[in-house]
């Protein structure tokens, strides 16, 4: 969250929330 809009979903999917 707050790192890269759009990529946040990818990180969240992999279990990593940036």
From Swiss-Prot:
Main localization of the protein described in the UniProt heading: secreted
Localization per record: Secreted; Target cell membrane
Keywords attached to this entry: Antibiotic, Antimicrobial, Fungicide, Membrane, Secreted, Target cell membrane, Target membrane
Cellular component GO terms held in the UniProt record: extracellular region; membrane; other organism cell membrane
GO biological process: antimicrobial humoral immune response mediated by antimicrobial peptide; defense response to fungus; defense response to Gram-negative bacterium; defense response to Gram-positive bacterium; killing of cells of another organism
Induction: Constitutively expressed.
Function: Has antifungal activity against yeasts like C.albicans MDM8 (MIC=15-30 uM), C.albicans IOC 4558 (MIC=7.5-15 uM), C.tropicalis IOC 4560 (MIC=3.8-7.5 uM) and C.guilliermondii IOC 4557 (MIC=3.8-7.5 uM) but not against filamentous fungi like A.niger, C.herbarum ATCC26362 or P.farinosus IBC251. Has weak activity against the Gram-positive bacterium M.luteus A270 (MIC=60-120 uM) and against Gram-negative bacteria P.aeruginosa ATCC27853 (MIC=60-120 uM) and S.marcescens ATCC4112 (MIC=60-120 uM).
Protein name, entry field: Longipin
Taxonomic source organism: Acutisoma longipes
Upper lineage: Eukaryota, Metazoa, Ecdysozoa, Arthropoda, Chelicerata
